[in-house]
């Protein structure tokens, strides 16, 4: 039985965005433009000042494993959106401890709902259609880490957690624009892509908040899943650069991630349903 809640959250309700980076900052700006009272965090005072100069309520917050997180107005919003990715090079136990401190602070501050930005890397590359009903079986360190963080948040009973598993994030400065850029990214060239444009990420998060779709797990990837080789070819045609020689096709294990549940529950239509078309379309102004 689904535990989803589908009421509508008033647009003036406070929301806190933990992590004002590549996704979190434009998300905070978009939510503020929709009428929400938004707080957003950066890890340093200098970073918080930079964000505040954009007209956002900014806070310097760095997750710590050994000490409790100090209280601040940031933590007193009923809705907390966690956009902090796993930290490369940091021990698994330390990252879990950081999230335990985060949960303690959210509980003490009265958070009612949490959205955790996870990843489709929780699914194995085993030729499957990956739906939310499949038990995660990550094989890479990043996927193992986010899977553990998902469980940690879902086990907490003082607030309701929705897990949002994004595919690879693309758009803006995360699009191949030269042969050198393609060469740097030319791993797994003959596998299907599970990606999502940042504009879609922002809109989907807003719909989850607006519709109060809490206590759920959603996958979020573009409808089409082109081979990476074809994606790079589309970029080269649109941007006028020559592709490096990838050699013959060498099929490799991959997965196809389904977003049908998200589209049905949120009545969501992707802005960029086919990654191959992104190079021909300007990015939407989500603000």
Predicted regions and their residues:
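NAD(P)-cofactor binding segment of oxidoreductase domains
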Residues: 75-115, 148
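Conserved beta-loop-beta element that borders a ligand/cofactor-binding pocket
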Residues: 148-172
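Conserved N-terminal Rossmann-fold NAD(P)-binding element of oxidoreductases
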Residues: 14-19
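Substrate-positioning beta->alpha
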Residues: 165-166, 175-178, 185-209
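N-terminal Rossmann-fold NAD(P) dinucleotide-binding loop
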Residues: 24-25
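C-terminal amphipathic/interface module of NAD(P)-dependent oxidoreductases
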Residues: 61-64, 250-287
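Conserved Rossmann-fold NAD(P)-dependent oxidoreductase catalytic core, especially the SDR/UDP-sugar
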Residues: 100-139
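Mid/C-terminal beta-alpha module of Rossmann-like enzyme folds, strongest
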Residues: 202-259
């Amino acid at each position: 039985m689904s535990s989803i809640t589908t009421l509508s959250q008033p647009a003036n309700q406070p929301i806190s965005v933990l992590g004002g980076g590549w996704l979190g900052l434009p998300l905070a700006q978009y939510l503020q433009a929709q009428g929400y009272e938004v707080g957003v965090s950066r890890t340093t005072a200098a970073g918080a000042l930079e964000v505040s100069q954009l007209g956002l309520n900014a806070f310097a917050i760095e997750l710590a494993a050994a000490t409790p997180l100090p209280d601040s107005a940031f933590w007193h919003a009923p809705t907390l959106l966690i956009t902090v990715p796993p930290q490369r090079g940091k021990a698994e136990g330390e990252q879990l401890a950081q999230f335990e401190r985060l949960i303690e602070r959210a509980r003490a501050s009265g958070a009612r709902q949490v959205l955790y930005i996870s990843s489709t890397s929780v699914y194995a590359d085993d030729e499957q259609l990956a739906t939310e009903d499949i038990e995660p079986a990550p094989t890479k360190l990043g996927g193992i880490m986010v899977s553990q963080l998902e469980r940690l948040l879902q086990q907490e009973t003082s607030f309701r957690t929705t897990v949002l598993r994004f595919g690879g994030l693309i758009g803006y400065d995360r699009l191949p624009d030269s042969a050198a850029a393609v060469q740097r990214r030319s791993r797994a060239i003959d596998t299907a892509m599970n990606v999502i444009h940042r504009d879609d990420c922002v809109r989907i998060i807003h719909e989850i908040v607006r519709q109060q779709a809490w206590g759920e797990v959603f996958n979020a990837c573009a409808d089409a899943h082109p081979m990476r080789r074809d994606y790079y070819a589309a970029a080269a045609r649109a941007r006028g650069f020559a592709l490096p020689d990838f050699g013959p096709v060498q099929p490799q294990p991959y997965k196809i991630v389904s977003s049908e549940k998200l589209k049905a529950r949120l009545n969501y239509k992707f802005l960029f349903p086919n990654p191959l078309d992104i190079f021909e379309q300007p990015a939407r102004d989500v603000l």
